[in-house]
């Protein structure tokens, strides 16, 4: 099996893997309470709810 003659630098590794990581797109879902787009498994920053529970107090 081929082995590298020298250690690949961090920049080489990151630039090689950049193509792989750019293939992932960010998943966005609608908040069930207010309908605003939010990241899944996160508290909605618009209304402060996570599922049925209010986690953040949002001043209006």
UniProtKB/Swiss-Prot annotation:
Cross-referenced PANTHER family: 50S RIBOSOMAL PROTEIN L32, LARGE RIBOSOMAL SUBUNIT PROTEIN BL32
- The species is Petrotoga mobilis (strain DSM 10674 / SJ95)
Tell me which InterPro entries the record gives.
Answer: Ribosomal_bL32, Ribosomal_bL32_bact, Ribosomal_zn-bd
This protein's GO CC annotations: large ribosomal subunit
The terms under GO molecular function for this entry are:
structural constituent of ribosome
Gene this chain is encoded by: rpmF
Q: Does the keyword Disulfide bond apply?
A: no
Q: Which family does it belong to?
A: Belongs to the bacterial ribosomal protein bL32 family.
What keywords appear on the UniProt entry?
Ribonucleoprotein, Ribosomal protein
Q: Per its UniProt entry, which superkingdom is the organism in?
A: Bacteria
Please, one GO biological process term?
translation
Q: What is this protein called?
A: Large ribosomal subunit protein bL32
């Amino acid at each position: 099996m081929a082995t590298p003659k020298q250690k690949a630098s961090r920049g080489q590794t990151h630039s090689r893997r950049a193509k792989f990581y750019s293939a992932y797109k960010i998943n966005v879902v609608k908040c069930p309470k207010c309908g605003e787009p939010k990241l899944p498994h996160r508290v909605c920053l618009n209304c402060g709810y996570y599922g049925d529970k209010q986690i953040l107090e949002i001043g209006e």
